Amino acid sequence: MPARQPPVRGDHVASTAPDATGCDARVAFVVSCEHGGNRVPPRYRELFARAQAALDSHRGYDPGALTVARQLARALVAPLVAATTTRLLVDLNRSPSHRKLHSEWIPASPPDIRAGIRARHYLPYRRRIEDLVAASIGRGQRVVHVSSHSFTPVFDGVVRNADVGILYDPGRPGEVALSARWIAALQARAPHLKVRRNYPYTGKSDGLCAWLRRHHAAADYVGIELEVNQRHVAPGRAEWRALRAAIIASLAEALELEKRA
C-alpha cells in the first residue's frame, strides 16, 4: 500500500484565481479538486466522533488529488478551486439532489443541519466554479476544466485495472478530442502505465463536470475528470513525482496539439 498522505488542513475552499488563460487567449483553464482533504469543521466534529476510519480512507477524501491539482494549476497558469473539507460532510462532486450528497453521519433531521452544511460548504464552492466558467465564456473564451481526483485500488473486493483514468462525455467532440490527445501523449511518455478512457467511472456520471455540461454548450465548455490510482500516491517517492510530471507534461502536449489542429 502507498504511504497515506496526512490529512489536509486549512479552509474548506482554497482558491487562487489569477485572471489568466494560459498561452492561448481564446482558451480559459480552470482546475478544481472537490475531494482534496478530510477536514471536519469544528461545529460538526461531534457527528464524526466514531468516523475516523472512514475519514482516513478513500471515503473521506482523494489522497494525492490536491497535489496534482496544484501542479496542474501552476503549469496552466490557471485558477484553482479546491476543497479540503471531507466529502463525508457534503460531496461537492454530486448534484444538489443526489441521494448521496451527504453521508450516513449527517442526520436528515432536523433539516436545518443539512441546509446549513449546504449553505456554508456546498453552495460557495459550486458557485465559485460556476462563476469562473461563466465569466470566461462571457468573455468569448472556451473553457477547459480539469477536475482532479484519485481512486482506491480495490473497491468492493474488485481490483481496479488502471493507473490513470481520463473521464469525459463521448457525446461532446471537444472532450473526445482532448482526451484522446492527452491519453496518447501520456502513454507515449509512460508506456508502462495503463491509461483508460472513462474508467473507473463513466464521464457522464453525476458529477461537477456533468452538471456544468448541462448549462454550457459543447463549443464553450470542455470538462475532463482526471482519476489517478491511489496505489501510486507515495509522498517523497520518485515514482510519484514522475507520474505527476508525466500527467502534466502530456496534458501540455495535448493542448499544444489541439491549438495547432
Predicted regions and their residues:
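N-terminal catalytic or cofactor-binding beta/alpha core of small enzyme domains
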Residues: 1-261
